[in-house]
Amino acid sequence: MASATFIEVILAIILPPVGVFLRYGLAVEFWICLLLTLLGYIPGIIYAVYVLVA
């Protein structure tokens, strides 16, 4: 289970919405992450890592 989280976090750093999508699908978390990534790459990364680790 820890290796899956590690892969999701790595994907979240490279392309934030992908990591969140793998865990939550098209839920609200994905759309928030996508919006933050479009508005600024760094906020998208921070949010994605926070959502995946929390």
Swiss-Prot record:
PROSITE patterns in alphabetical order: UPF0057
Annotated keywords: Membrane, Stress response, Transmembrane, Transmembrane helix
Official protein name in the record: Low temperature-induced protein lt101.2
Signal peptide (from-to): none
Membrane-traversing stretches: 2-22, 34-54
Lineage: Eukaryota, Viridiplantae, Streptophyta, Embryophyta, Tracheophyta
Pfam families documented for this protein: Pmp3
Transmembrane helix found in the keyword field: yes
Source organism superkingdom: Eukaryota
Family: Belongs to the UPF0057 (PMP3) family.
GO CC terms: membrane
InterPro entries cross-referenced by the UniProt entry: PMP3
Topology class, membrane: Multi-pass membrane protein
Compartmental location: Membrane
Induction: By cold shock and salt stress.
